């Protein structure tokens, strides 16, 4: 019988996701600027919603690029 390995969330459950924490947000965005899906990030549904809102807010504020400038 094969058991699925339980993934640990990369962000602690009680830890707030702030749009000003650009280094954290960059970990959840592809090189093309797309937000990674929950099945890849390993976040809970609530954390994924908060992360998406934070990334979008950071983009609007100019802290995070819509598309990666490198390459």
From Swiss-Prot:
InterPro entries: Ribosomal_bS18, Ribosomal_bS18_sf. One of its GO terms (cellular component) is cytosolic small ribosomal subunit. One of its GO terms (molecular function) is structural constituent of ribosome. GO terms for biological process: translation. Binds as a heterodimer with protein bS6 to the central domain of the 16S rRNA, where it helps stabilize the platform of the 30S subunit. Belongs to the bacterial ribosomal protein bS18 family. This is Small ribosomal subunit protein bS18. It comes from Synechococcus sp. (strain JA-2-3B'a(2-13)) (Cyanobacteria bacterium Yellowstone B-Prime).
